[in-house]
């Protein structure tokens, strides 16, 4: 594996947020519990992803877990209380749902780099990422029904779109675990590489993506998500279209005419069929 010098962009307690040549890397840093997340972990990830979204130097975002044994094992059951996962303020939350939605609407590709276990809510995080590079030691699966939990959102509905309804039911009803090759065969990941090559492969995919039009990638992500995200997905794609329209001379003519208190001259712009 190439020894890269990742730059720390911000210090957190339960995650790492780093940068390397146009790539932001968000790492869940709780290896002692297989990178299970708490409300604080999720809040820190939301903050880091939001910063990556706004950072013009970031083209692609990588989500991973600290160490080689786990990507993420879902919510920390020791923090689970009445009505949700209890944070330092003693308020029960399921703020991971906000994180899932954020990953979907960020107009930049998000790649899951999976080493070891991606189970429970960890597998759902894998599911909502745009692409997945899996190490050959990766293990995937859902555990909710074993521990009195479930994900009736992306973790089931979108999972069924990816692997098929019969397979998704098998994953949830039986709570089995699947190795990296099985995950590849069902379409849950994009590629499988040796553990010591997984970061090299992930960076290579990022570099290839970064050669392409960011506006085209933004619209492609929004279009593919709109199919499963309903009106919220359409709103995202429409918002992206509005931002693009604001950069045109036609939109600027309307703005300038209003500011100059005159009628706009839209006749100068083409009306393509």
Curated annotation (Swiss-Prot):
GO molecular function: 1,4-dihydroxy-2-naphthoyl-CoA synthase activity
GO annotation (BP), single: menaquinone biosynthetic process
Keyword annotations from UniProtKB, A to Z: Lyase, Menaquinone biosynthesis
Cofactors named for this entry: hydrogencarbonate
Site location (Important for catalysis): 85, 246
Signal peptide start-end: none
Residues noted as binding substrate in the record, renumbered to the chain: 34, 73-77, 85, 117-121, 143, 149, 246, 261
Compositionally biased tracts (Basic and acidic residues): 254-265
Enzyme class: lyase
Catalytic activity entry: 2-succinylbenzoyl-CoA + H(+) = 1,4-dihydroxy-2-naphthoyl-CoA + H2O
GO cellular component: cytosol
EC code(s) of this entry: 4.1.3.36
Listed InterPro entries: ClpP/crotonase-like_dom_sf, DHNA-CoA_synthase_MenB, Enoyl-CoA_hydra/iso, Enoyl-CoA_hydra_C
Domain of life according to the entry: Bacteria
Binding site for hydrogencarbonate: 142-144
Pfam families referenced in this protein's UniProt entry, alphabetically: ECH_1
Region named Disordered: 254-273
Pathway the protein takes part in: Quinol/quinone metabolism; 1,4-dihydroxy-2-naphthoate biosynthesis; 1,4-dihydroxy-2-naphthoate from chorismate: step 6/7; Quinol/quinone metabolism; menaquinone biosynthesis
Classification via PANTHER family: 1,4-DIHYDROXY-2-NAPHTHOYL-COA SYNTHASE, PEROXISOMAL (PTHR43113:SF1), NUCLEOSIDE-DIPHOSPHATE-SUGAR EPIMERASE (PTHR43113)
Function: Converts o-succinylbenzoyl-CoA (OSB-CoA) to 1,4-dihydroxy-2-naphthoyl-CoA (DHNA-CoA).
NCBIfam families: menB (TIGR01929), PRK07396.1 (NF005637)
Stated family: Belongs to the enoyl-CoA hydratase/isomerase family. MenB subfamily.
The protein's name in its UniProt record: 1,4-dihydroxy-2-naphthoyl-CoA synthase
The organism's taxonomic lineage, starting at the top: Bacteria, Bacillati, Bacillota, Bacilli, Bacillales
Name of the gene encoding the protein in the UniProt record: menB
């Amino acid at each position: 594996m190439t020894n890269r010098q990742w730059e720390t962009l911000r210090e957190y307690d339960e995650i790492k947020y780093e940068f390397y040549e146009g790539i932001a890397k968000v790492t869940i840093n709780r290896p002692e519990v297989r990178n299970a997340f708490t409300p604080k972990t999720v809040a820190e990830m939301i903050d880091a992803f939001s910063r990556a979204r706004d950072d013009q130097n970031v083209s692609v975002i990588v989500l991973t877990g600290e160490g080689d044994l786990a990507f993420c094992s879902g919510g920390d059951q020791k923090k689970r209380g009445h009505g949700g996962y209890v944070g330092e303020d003693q308020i029960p939350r399921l703020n991971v749902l906000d994180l899932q939605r954020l990953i979907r609407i960020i107009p930049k590709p998000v790649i899951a780099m999976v080493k070891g276990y991606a189970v429970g809510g960890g597998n759902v995080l894998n599911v909502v990422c745009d692409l997945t590079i899996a190490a050959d030691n990766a293990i995937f699966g859902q555990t909710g029904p074993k521990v009195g939990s479930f994900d009736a959102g992306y973790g089931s509905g979108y999972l069924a779109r990816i692997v098929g309804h019969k397979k998704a039911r098998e994953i949830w009803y039986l709570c089995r675990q699947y190795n990296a090759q099985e995950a590849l065969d069902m379409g849950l990941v994009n590629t499988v590489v040796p553990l010591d090559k997984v970061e090299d492969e992930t960076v290579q995919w990022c570099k290839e993506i970064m050669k392409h039009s960011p506006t085209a990638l933004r619209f492609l992500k929004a279009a593919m998500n709109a199919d499963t995200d309903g009106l919220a997905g359409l709103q995202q794609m429409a918002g992206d279209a509005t931002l693009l329209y604001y950069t045109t001379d036609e939109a600027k003519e309307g703005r300038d005419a209003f500011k100059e208190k005159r009628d706009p001259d839209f006749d100068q712009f083409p009306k393509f069929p």
